């Protein structure tokens, strides 16, 4: 599969593969990911929204409704749900996607859970690349849901246009 061609066709499977490549710790995957991202124009027509708050405040439930509002306006919505990592496997342990069931079923939505891999700041070290790939795949609204964080972990604010703190 040529990821560049498939991303231009708005293929969600290609987007998933491209994000997996970006998140990989293998050097060869990083090189491929960097080359892929560099092929896309550096335009930013999307709206990037960061959503943060303490664990259990309702971030995923809010995103479920918020994302549907954008879809009803004719927008394509990507959600990058950053979860805490298992110390053993470094994989995601919560699975916020299950709390966005209706949004996940919509053909104009893409939800990607990703582990933070122990990185502080509420996001992963590859969240920026994931945002760029979602933009390349034609998403109008990109929502980044952080790990439930405290007030000092606001790295996401450097990656988004709008930051929402749920309390």
Model regions and ranges:
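Walker A/P-loop
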Residues: 60
